[in-house]
Protein backbone atom coordinates (compact mmCIF):
# COMPACT_ATOMS: atom_id res chain seq x y z
CA UNK A 1 0.00 0.00 0.00
CA UNK A 2 1.11 3.54 -0.81
CA UNK A 3 -0.17 6.69 0.87
CA UNK A 4 -0.15 10.40 0.13
CA UNK A 5 -1.35 12.77 2.83
CA UNK A 6 -2.51 16.24 1.83
CA UNK A 7 -2.64 18.88 4.55
CA UNK A 8 -3.73 22.48 4.27
CA UNK A 9 -1.58 24.87 6.30
CA UNK A 10 -2.60 25.79 9.83
CA UNK A 11 -4.56 28.96 10.50
CA UNK A 12 -2.69 32.01 9.22
CA UNK A 13 -2.90 35.55 10.56
CA UNK A 14 -5.10 36.50 7.60
CA UNK A 15 -7.29 33.39 8.01
CA UNK A 16 -7.86 34.70 11.53
CA UNK A 17 -8.81 38.12 10.10
CA UNK A 18 -10.87 36.49 7.31
CA UNK A 19 -8.84 38.14 4.53
CA UNK A 20 -8.13 36.97 0.99
CA UNK A 21 -4.52 35.83 1.15
CA UNK A 22 -3.49 34.17 -2.10
CA UNK A 23 0.23 34.64 -2.79
CA UNK A 24 0.70 37.11 0.08
CA UNK A 25 3.30 35.55 2.39
CA UNK A 26 1.43 35.67 5.69
CA UNK A 27 2.66 33.83 8.79
CA UNK A 28 0.84 31.29 10.93
CA UNK A 29 -1.18 32.45 13.91
CA UNK A 30 -0.52 30.91 17.34
CA UNK A 31 -3.55 28.70 16.72
CA UNK A 32 -2.08 27.66 13.36
CA UNK A 33 1.20 26.64 14.99
CA UNK A 34 -0.70 24.48 17.47
CA UNK A 35 -2.85 23.00 14.69
CA UNK A 36 0.29 21.85 12.88
CA UNK A 37 1.65 20.22 16.04
CA UNK A 38 -1.68 18.52 16.68
CA UNK A 39 -1.76 17.16 13.11
CA UNK A 40 1.77 15.83 13.53
CA UNK A 41 0.88 14.13 16.79
CA UNK A 42 -2.17 12.53 15.20
CA UNK A 43 -0.23 11.19 12.22
CA UNK A 44 2.54 9.91 14.49
CA UNK A 45 -0.05 8.11 16.61
CA UNK A 46 -1.52 6.56 13.44
CA UNK A 47 1.92 5.22 12.48
CA UNK A 48 2.73 7.37 9.45
CA UNK A 49 6.41 7.33 8.44
CA UNK A 50 6.90 9.82 5.62
CA UNK A 51 10.11 9.62 3.64
CA UNK A 52 9.45 12.54 1.27
CA UNK A 53 7.55 15.83 1.52
CA UNK A 54 6.51 18.73 -0.69
CA UNK A 55 5.36 22.25 0.04
CA UNK A 56 4.92 25.69 -1.52
CA UNK A 57 7.06 28.85 -1.41
CA UNK A 58 4.75 30.42 1.19
CA UNK A 59 5.74 30.38 4.86
CA UNK A 60 2.34 29.35 6.22
CA UNK A 61 2.65 26.03 4.37
CA UNK A 62 6.40 25.68 4.97
CA UNK A 63 6.02 26.27 8.72
CA UNK A 64 3.08 23.88 8.92
CA UNK A 65 5.19 21.19 7.27
CA UNK A 66 8.12 21.94 9.59
CA UNK A 67 5.85 21.78 12.64
CA UNK A 68 4.39 18.44 11.57
CA UNK A 69 7.77 16.88 10.79
CA UNK A 70 9.29 18.15 14.03
CA UNK A 71 6.59 16.50 16.14
CA UNK A 72 6.98 13.28 14.13
CA UNK A 73 10.81 13.29 14.47
CA UNK A 74 11.05 13.39 10.69
CA UNK A 75 12.94 16.68 10.26
CA UNK A 76 15.59 14.79 8.30
CA UNK A 77 13.46 13.70 5.34
CA UNK A 78 13.97 15.44 1.97
CA UNK A 79 11.59 18.34 1.29
CA UNK A 80 10.97 19.96 -2.09
CA UNK A 81 9.50 23.46 -2.31
CA UNK A 82 7.75 24.67 -5.45
CA UNK A 83 5.85 27.81 -6.43
CA UNK A 84 3.44 25.53 -8.27
CA UNK A 85 1.91 24.48 -4.93
CA UNK A 86 1.20 28.11 -3.97
CA UNK A 87 -2.36 29.15 -3.18
CA UNK A 88 -4.64 30.44 -5.92
CA UNK A 89 -3.71 34.05 -6.77
CA UNK A 90 -6.61 36.32 -5.79
CA UNK A 91 -5.49 39.38 -7.75
CA UNK A 92 -6.73 42.70 -6.38
CA UNK A 93 -8.76 40.90 -3.70
CA UNK A 94 -5.61 39.99 -1.78
CA UNK A 95 -5.68 41.67 1.62
CA UNK A 96 -9.43 42.43 1.59
CA UNK A 97 -11.76 41.11 4.28
CA UNK A 98 -14.04 38.42 2.82
CA UNK A 99 -17.17 39.34 4.80
CA UNK A 100 -16.77 43.06 4.07
CA UNK A 101 -16.27 42.28 0.39
CA UNK A 102 -19.48 40.22 0.49
CA UNK A 103 -21.32 43.17 2.05
CA UNK A 104 -20.18 45.32 -0.87
CA UNK A 105 -20.57 42.90 -3.79
CA UNK A 106 -22.93 40.21 -2.44
CA UNK A 107 -22.39 36.63 -1.26
CA UNK A 108 -22.89 35.18 -4.73
CA UNK A 109 -20.21 37.33 -6.37
CA UNK A 110 -17.70 36.60 -3.60
CA UNK A 111 -18.41 32.88 -3.89
CA UNK A 112 -17.70 33.14 -7.63
CA UNK A 113 -14.40 34.90 -6.95
CA UNK A 114 -13.45 32.41 -4.24
CA UNK A 115 -14.52 29.18 -5.85
CA UNK A 116 -15.68 29.57 -9.46
CA UNK A 117 -13.78 27.17 -11.66
CA UNK A 118 -13.20 29.61 -14.50
CA UNK A 119 -13.89 33.19 -13.32
CA UNK A 120 -10.82 35.00 -11.90
CA UNK A 121 -10.91 38.12 -9.69
CA UNK A 122 -9.69 41.45 -11.10
CA UNK A 123 -5.93 41.14 -11.74
CA UNK A 124 -3.38 43.28 -9.93
CA UNK A 125 -0.88 45.35 -11.89
CA UNK A 126 2.46 43.80 -12.78
CA UNK A 127 4.23 46.71 -11.01
CA UNK A 128 2.11 46.36 -7.85
CA UNK A 129 4.46 45.86 -4.85
CA UNK A 130 2.44 42.71 -4.03
CA UNK A 131 2.99 41.26 -7.50
CA UNK A 132 5.10 38.09 -7.88
CA UNK A 133 7.04 40.02 -10.55
CA UNK A 134 8.36 42.20 -7.70
CA UNK A 135 9.23 39.25 -5.42
CA UNK A 136 12.79 37.85 -5.59
CA UNK A 137 11.68 34.30 -4.74
CA UNK A 138 10.08 34.03 -8.21
CA UNK A 139 13.08 35.38 -10.10
CA UNK A 140 13.80 31.95 -11.59
CA UNK A 141 10.21 31.38 -12.77
CA UNK A 142 9.39 32.08 -16.41
CA UNK A 143 7.46 35.37 -16.54
CA UNK A 144 4.68 33.91 -18.68
CA UNK A 145 3.95 31.45 -15.85
CA UNK A 146 3.57 34.06 -13.11
CA UNK A 147 -0.06 35.01 -12.38
CA UNK A 148 -1.58 38.39 -11.52
CA UNK A 149 -4.88 36.66 -10.79
CA UNK A 150 -6.25 33.12 -11.16
CA UNK A 151 -9.47 31.20 -11.45
CA UNK A 152 -9.40 27.72 -9.94
CA UNK A 153 -8.85 26.22 -13.41
CA UNK A 154 -5.64 28.27 -13.69
CA UNK A 155 -4.45 26.97 -10.31
CA UNK A 156 -5.21 23.39 -11.36
CA UNK A 157 -3.35 23.85 -14.66
CA UNK A 158 -0.38 25.30 -12.76
CA UNK A 159 -0.22 22.34 -10.37
CA UNK A 160 -0.92 19.46 -12.74
CA UNK A 161 2.48 19.27 -14.47
CA UNK A 162 4.26 19.13 -11.12
CA UNK A 163 1.78 16.62 -9.73
CA UNK A 164 2.00 14.33 -12.75
CA UNK A 165 5.74 14.59 -13.33
CA UNK A 166 7.10 14.90 -9.80
CA UNK A 167 4.84 14.24 -6.80
CA UNK A 168 2.75 11.28 -7.95
CA UNK A 169 5.69 9.32 -9.47
CA UNK A 170 7.45 9.67 -6.09
CA UNK A 171 5.18 6.87 -4.86
CA UNK A 172 7.22 4.43 -6.92
CA UNK A 173 10.14 4.99 -4.54
CA UNK A 174 8.40 6.20 -1.36
CA UNK A 175 5.53 4.45 0.41
CA UNK A 176 4.32 7.54 2.27
CA UNK A 177 4.49 11.12 0.99
CA UNK A 178 3.31 14.33 2.66
CA UNK A 179 2.14 17.45 0.80
CA UNK A 180 1.60 20.63 2.83
CA UNK A 181 -0.01 23.36 0.75
CA UNK A 182 -3.15 25.51 0.46
CA UNK A 183 -6.91 25.18 0.13
CA UNK A 184 -7.12 25.77 -3.61
CA UNK A 185 -3.87 24.13 -4.67
CA UNK A 186 -4.89 21.00 -2.76
CA UNK A 187 -8.38 21.26 -4.23
CA UNK A 188 -6.76 20.97 -7.66
CA UNK A 189 -4.93 17.77 -6.68
CA UNK A 190 -8.07 16.28 -5.14
CA UNK A 191 -10.05 17.11 -8.28
CA UNK A 192 -7.66 14.98 -10.31
CA UNK A 193 -7.36 12.13 -7.81
CA UNK A 194 -11.12 11.75 -7.36
CA UNK A 195 -12.20 12.86 -10.84
CA UNK A 196 -14.45 15.57 -9.40
CA UNK A 197 -16.39 17.73 -11.87
CA UNK A 198 -15.73 21.44 -12.39
CA UNK A 199 -19.12 22.18 -10.82
CA UNK A 200 -18.66 20.01 -7.71
CA UNK A 201 -15.09 20.96 -6.85
CA UNK A 202 -16.11 24.49 -5.82
CA UNK A 203 -18.13 23.07 -2.89
CA UNK A 204 -15.20 21.12 -1.42
CA UNK A 205 -14.11 22.84 1.80
CA UNK A 206 -10.76 21.92 3.35
CA UNK A 207 -10.22 22.82 7.02
CA UNK A 208 -6.83 24.03 8.20
CA UNK A 209 -4.30 21.39 9.30
CA UNK A 210 -6.57 18.35 8.97
CA UNK A 211 -4.69 15.45 7.30
CA UNK A 212 -6.46 14.05 4.23
CA UNK A 213 -5.20 10.55 3.44
CA UNK A 214 -5.20 8.90 0.00
CA UNK A 215 -4.36 5.19 -0.16
CA UNK A 216 -3.19 3.47 -3.35
CA UNK A 217 -2.51 -0.13 -4.30
CA UNK A 218 0.87 -1.20 -5.67
CA UNK A 219 -0.29 -0.23 -9.18
CA UNK A 220 -0.98 3.30 -7.89
CA UNK A 221 -4.73 2.98 -8.22
CA UNK A 222 -6.69 4.92 -5.61
CA UNK A 223 -8.24 2.55 -3.09
CA UNK A 224 -9.76 4.93 -0.54
CA UNK A 225 -9.50 8.42 0.92
CA UNK A 226 -10.40 9.78 4.35
CA UNK A 227 -9.73 12.61 6.79
CA UNK A 228 -7.89 11.87 10.03
CA UNK A 229 -9.80 13.04 13.08
CA UNK A 230 -13.27 13.17 14.57
CA UNK A 231 -15.86 13.21 11.73
CA UNK A 232 -18.28 15.54 13.53
CA UNK A 233 -15.54 18.02 14.38
CA UNK A 234 -14.22 17.95 10.80
CA UNK A 235 -17.75 18.57 9.48
CA UNK A 236 -18.04 21.68 11.67
CA UNK A 237 -14.66 22.92 10.48
CA UNK A 238 -15.70 22.45 6.84
CA UNK A 239 -18.89 24.44 7.44
CA UNK A 240 -16.85 27.24 9.00
CA UNK A 241 -14.66 27.41 5.88
CA UNK A 242 -17.76 27.55 3.66
CA UNK A 243 -19.13 30.49 5.66
CA UNK A 244 -15.98 32.63 5.47
CA UNK A 245 -17.07 34.49 2.34
CA UNK A 246 -20.58 35.35 3.53
CA UNK A 247 -21.95 38.58 4.93
CA UNK A 248 -21.76 39.03 8.68
UniProtKB/Swiss-Prot annotation:
InterPro entries: His_Pase_superF_clade-1, His_PPase_superfam, PG/BPGM_mutase_AS, Phosphogly_mut1. One of its GO terms (biological process) is glycolytic process. Pathway: Carbohydrate degradation; glycolysis; pyruvate from D-glyceraldehyde 3-phosphate: step 3/5. One of its GO terms (molecular function) is phosphoglycerate mutase activity. Pfam families: His_Phos_1. It catalyses: (2R)-2-phosphoglycerate = (2R)-3-phosphoglycerate. It is an enzyme of class 5 (isomerase). Keywords: Gluconeogenesis, Glycolysis, Isomerase. PROSITE patterns: PG_MUTASE (PS00175). The record marks 182 as: Transition state stabilizer. Substrate binds at residues 8-15, 21-22, 60, 87-90, 98, 114-115, 183-184. The keyword Glycoprotein does not apply. The active site is at 9 (tele-phosphohistidine intermediate), 87 (proton donor/acceptor). It comes from the Bacteria. Its EC number is 5.4.2.11. Belongs to the phosphoglycerate mutase family. BPG-dependent PGAM subfamily. NCBIfam families: pgm_1 (TIGR01258), PRK14115.1 (NF010713). Catalyzes the interconversion of 2-phosphoglycerate and 3-phosphoglycerate. This is 2,3-bisphosphoglycerate-dependent phosphoglycerate mutase. It comes from Porphyromonas gingivalis (strain ATCC BAA-308 / W83).
